[in-house]
């Protein structure tokens, strides 16, 4: 019997793993007589390989139809070896068994050899005609060795297609917008507006720069101002986002504190605040300085009302 190339014994396959060929008898649902098949390597031949072998024995008008193999009432999976699908016993039990009889004992004859029983595989021929691509995919998983080779080829191609690791650092902050189609002038204008917002709640000596500014921009872009209001745990070091939303929304507590304490200081200690601001420029943020000025105005208004009355 002639076997296709993918079912012929492979030179790299260890023949000791099986005790002999697997004897099968294929029984069809259509009016086609049964025929025997001998599978040399059932440990590496899959159900798809058996289908390929069966197609060589079918009439030309049925060789491309969809086949379904059934054994013991259960369908065989295409990618599973026959030794697993058919639940074959270990290889020594598939070899011919020598039975002793009286002639052997007397030395007057040879022991008869019990032939290995054949397994019946039911083959259902469907009405759907497979395309060339489907037949090629079926042939690609005819043996487990072909599957392993295909997996190795796919892994090798995937490694070749992967770009080499870049040595340049990824852009951070608003620089990420350059890859999204923004021009450098637009990114610079956006950064200027962002710095103007930060100057409302920060003094000049606490304005973020460098990596701190990039981290602040990343957080603003990724999480929004509500995440900035959550702040960064820790002591005096790190970045605080409590006052970075301009005093509105979830982070307005810092803005309210600035306005309240600034107004109280301007109302009860106007002269001291004026001297302090004169000697140390930039000691308060713009928001706190405005609150101090409002407190001073309220103090003057109360004083004028008291004098007039």
From Swiss-Prot:
The chain crosses the membrane at residues 257-277, 289-309. It is a multi-pass membrane protein. The keyword Transferase does not apply. CDD domains: Ubl_ubiquitin_like. InterPro entries: Dsc3, Dsc3_C, Dsc3_ub-like_dom, Ubiquitin-like_domsf. Keywords: Endoplasmic reticulum, Glycoprotein, Membrane, Transmembrane, Transmembrane helix, Ubl conjugation pathway. Disruption phenotype: Impairs growth on solid media under hypoxia and leads to triazole susceptibility. Impairs virulence in a murine model of invasive pulmonary aspergillosis (IPA). Residues 88-110, 148-177 are annotated as: Disordered. Belongs to the dsc3 family. Component of the DSC E3 ubiquitin ligase complex composed of dscA, dscB, dscC and dscD. This is DSC E3 ubiquitin ligase complex subunit C. It comes from Aspergillus fumigatus (strain ATCC MYA-4609 / CBS 101355 / FGSC A1100 / Af293) (Neosartorya fumigata). The gene is dscC.
């Amino acid at each position: 019997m002639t076997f296709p190339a993918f079912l012929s014994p492979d030179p790299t396959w260890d023949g000791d793993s099986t005790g002999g060929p697997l004897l099968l008898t294929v029984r069809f649902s259509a009016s086609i007589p049964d025929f025997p098949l001998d599978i040399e390597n059932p440990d590496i031949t899959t159900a798809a390989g058996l289908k390929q072998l069966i197609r060589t024995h079918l009439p030309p008008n049925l060789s491309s139809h969809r086949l379904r193999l059934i054994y013991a009432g259960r369908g065989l999976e295409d990618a599973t070896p026959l030794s697993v699908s058919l639940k074959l016993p270990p290889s020594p039990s598939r070899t011919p068994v020598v039975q002793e009889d009286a002639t052997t004992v007397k030395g007057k004859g040879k022991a008869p050899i019990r032939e290995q029983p054949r397994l019946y595989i039911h083959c259902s021929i469907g009405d759907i005609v497979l395309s060339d691509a489907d037949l090629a995919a079926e042939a690609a998983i005819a043996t487990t060795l072909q599957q392993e080779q295909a997996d190795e080829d796919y892994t090798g191609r995937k490694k070749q297609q992967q770009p080499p690791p870049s040595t340049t650092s990824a852009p951070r902050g608003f620089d990420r917008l350059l890859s999204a189609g923004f021009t450098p002038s637009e990114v610079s204008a956006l950064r200027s507006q962002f710095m103007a917002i930060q100057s409302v709640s920060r003094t000049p000596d606490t304005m973020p720069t460098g990596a701190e500014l990039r981290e602040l921009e990343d957080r603003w872009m990724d999480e929004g101002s509500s995440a900035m209001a959550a702040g960064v745990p820790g002591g005096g070091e790190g970045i605080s986002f409590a006052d970075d939303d301009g005093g509105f929304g979830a982070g307005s507590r810092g803005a309210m504190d600035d306005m309240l304490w600034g107004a109280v200081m301007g109302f009860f200690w106007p002269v001291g605040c004026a001297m302090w601001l004169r000697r140390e420029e930039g000691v308060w943020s713009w928001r706190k300085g405005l609150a101090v000025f409002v407190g001073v105005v309220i103090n003057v208004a109360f004083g004028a009302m008291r004098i007039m009355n």
